[in-house]
């Protein structure tokens, strides 16, 4: 992930074009999450969505390096986010099935901790590779296909829980998942409205990395600060998840938003190398 904005800049993408790319990609992920999540509920299946989602994301990695045409890059990045959208709802449902009201934070915190540990190991290996082969970003995308395939293969160890009720076959238009809004409880609606407002002011982590690079950090330090952020994320996700079960999910969520605000304000005015690490430390706690 930290390689991508640097790679896009080297092949001629402007910051505006990178922003449009990320917007299209995240919109694809968001819409596919809603549709795939509902389809997973209707079919009673979780694992096939997880497998298909990881497969799409794996395929997208070498696609980023095959051609450098903007439309092709848009297509490859969208495939990656489409895969994320397909698997996310089903994966979270699998986690929810294993959690109780008292262990929600613990279960999801443990998942995020291990998931983010991979985001530490991957960029670290990429950093080592770039030390010996500077600027060879394309090869890294080809190499990234290997762990992607391993993720798909490991997903075959998962098993769906037996569903007693036979699910009827129904036609499901793509935007039909939006109908849930009408029947959802008021507490859910308030949460979604709050998240929507937050998302409108949020931006991709790509821009934080580009800001760091724009402020004078070289490619190695940009990747290094991203590794540091993910390391903090991985270390604290599980214990903070446990704490959230004790003090309340809402309290931890609000504290996270405060950290987010501090980080983005700091990023807008900071040019100091060491302060970037402080800000990414707080960003890791927020995440």
Regions found by a protein language model. Give the residues of each.
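Transmembrane alpha-helix termini and helix-breaking/packing motifs in multi-pass membrane transporters
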Residues: 6, 10, 121-141
